[in-house]
């Protein structure tokens, strides 16, 4: 799935990863998903200090405690759930919006980890994006950074007959082997 359509990247991205590098990552992960018979990956981060799976897939970090959830299908573009107003649903053009690339839809909700009455907001939107995969296999990436509410809500709802597997190692083995671009970023960081 080639999503390379020239798009001007926003100045809001701090030293953005090239679209070609993102596509290399997505292709490698999708091949591993095919091998392991995983239909879709689900990941969630709420900070950029540890893990960074959201950033690895989207080039946008989760920050300041606001959760970002990524639904990464084996055969389609991503859906991202992030902080926003109730009912926020934005379809992105091919190539992205200057910030998000490889994403077909952004769903928003005003969820806060410190407000327990919002615990179901993110899972409800993730469930919308995961609906085509009910009864299939969902790979959970970085379960130690995913809220209990996310997985609990999914497993008790429409996904009760869905197979959930730990998929962090699937992604980590790909993340561990650095491309030339990633190696240059590491050198640039070390140089500072």
Protein language model features and the residues they cover:
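A composition/biophysics-driven feature that prefers long, compositionally simple stretches
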Residues: 1-192
């Amino acid at each position: 799935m080639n999503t390379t359509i020239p798009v001007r990247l926003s100045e809001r991205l701090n030293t953005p990863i090239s679209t070609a590098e993102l596509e290399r990552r997505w292709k490698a992960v999708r091949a591993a998903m095919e091998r392991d018979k995983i239909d879709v990956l689900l990941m969630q981060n709420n900070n950029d200090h540890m893990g960074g799976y959201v950033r690895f897939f989207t080039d946008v970090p989760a920050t300041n405690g606001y959760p970002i959830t990524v639904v990464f299908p084996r055969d389609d573009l991503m859906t991202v759930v992030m902080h926003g107003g109730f009912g926020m649903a934005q379809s992105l053009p091919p190539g992205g919006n200057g910030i998000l690339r490889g994403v077909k839809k952004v769903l928003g909700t005003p969820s806060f980890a410190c407000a327990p009455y919002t615990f179901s907001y993110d899972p409800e939107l993730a469930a919308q994006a995961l609906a085509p995969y009910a009864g299939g296999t969902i790979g959970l990436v970085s379960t130690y950074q995913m809220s209990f509410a996310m997985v609990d809500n999914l497993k008790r709802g429409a996904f009760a007959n869905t197979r959930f597997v730990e998929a962090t190692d699937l992604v980590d083995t790909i993340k561990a082997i650095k491309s030339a671009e990633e190696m240059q970023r590491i050198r640039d960081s070390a140089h500072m």
